[in-house]
Regions:
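A structural signal for short, well-ordered beta-strand segments
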Residues: 11-13, 69, 88-90
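Conserved hydrophobic "DFG−1" position in protein kinase catalytic cores
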Residues: 15-16, 24, 90-92, 107
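Active-site-adjacent beta-strand/loop module that shapes the phosphate/pyrophosphate-binding cleft
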Residues: 73-96, 129
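A short coil-to-beta-strand element that immediately follows conserved catalytic motifs
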Residues: 63-71
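NUDIX/MutT-family hydrolases
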Residues: 89, 98-129
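Short connector loops at helix/strand junctions that flank enzyme active sites
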Residues: 8, 37, 64, 81-85
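Conserved Nudix-box catalytic region and its N-terminal flanking loop in Nudix hydrolases
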Residues: 21-58
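Conserved N-terminal beta-strand and adjoining loop/helix that marks the start
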Residues: 1-22, 38
Length: 134
């Protein structure tokens, strides 16, 4: 008998400007330590694009426009469960950057990324986003 895996949809967004900066979050919870890209889960009855806009607003205070889906990353998570990470990028945004209960949000130079303690797979995720053929 085949087992069907439960799938949890999540998103992350590489928010960048034209001066070489990216937006990162240092999460409060220790389940994924290190800096990461902002994002979160897709909720019931919302599209994947609605979810990334909502999550970015909740975590960073910014309203993003025209996020581009660049890649999908899969993480097996125990028996019969997997996460699908929907990886976006966006350079159209408005509002003031503010941290949330999720963690401290701040801008860094993209070229300085490896000076920070990175969360698991962050290098790979950013590479997937930056190398996407859109």
């Amino acid at each position: 008998m085949e087992k069907i895996s439960k799938v949890i949809l999540s998103n992350m967004c590489l928010i960048y400007d034209n001066n070489g900066h990216i937006l990162v979050i240092e999460r409060t919870k220790n389940d994924w330590p290190g800096i990461n890209l902002p994002g979160g889960h897709v909720e019931e009855n919302e599209t994947i694009d609605e979810a990334v806009v909502r999550e970015i607003k909740e975590e960073t205070g910014l309203t993003i426009k025209n996020p581009k889906l660049c890649a999908i990353k899969e993480w097996p998570w125990g028996e019969n469960l997997r996460y699908l990470g929907l990886l976006y990028k966006c350079n159209e945004f408005e509002g003031e950057i503010k941290s949330s209960d999720e963690g401290k949000v701040f801008r860094i130079k993209r070229s300085d990324l490896n000076k920070y303690k990175l969360s698991q797979d962050l290098d790979e995720l950013i590479s997937l986003i930056e190398n996407a053929k859109l």
